[in-house]
Amino acid sequence: MNVRNKNAKAFICKVDRESSRLSVNLLFGSGKTIISTPDRGRSEGHFVPPDEDDAGYIAIATGGKSEQWLHTLAHEYTHMLQWFRDHPLWLEWQEKGTEIAYYKLEEYTERQACRLIEKHGLPCGDHMSRADKYLRDLRNSLTP
């Protein structure tokens, strides 16, 4: 992972610093996806909160374009903040585990990630279109 953009470097340092304070490790994989579920499901990023026995982690696949994985980092960082702040949508998803609760959480998370991208001047290209496509694909995958 070679990051040259100063805003991207600063954001990565911010995420690393804040996650460390919350017992969350920041991990980067070199592939286009990472293993993100016990059944070896794959994704571009994943957040797991810490528990009483183990540190949590944010894992990001960096094998694609940096504009894409920086967007994923903003998304997973947002999940970490939701967990830490006991955000109602995070708690609802944790409690209910339903597809609709997950979709509502992801919709909010993408909006927040796009705000972070803009606030920190991250070089993420057309992040709004990427977010819209992700949410459209997720919505289309919901059980009718």
Predicted regions and their residues:
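Catalytic zinc-binding patch centered on the HExxH motif and its immediate surroundings
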Residues: 10-13, 17, 21-59, 66-67
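Charge-rich, solvent-exposed alpha-helical interaction surfaces
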Residues: 11-14, 18, 76, 116, ...
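Short His-Asn-centered micro-motif
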Residues: 60-63, 83
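Post-HEXXH active-site segment of zinc metalloproteases
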Residues: 67, 83-115
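Active-site recognition of the HExxH zinc-binding catalytic motif
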Residues: 71-84
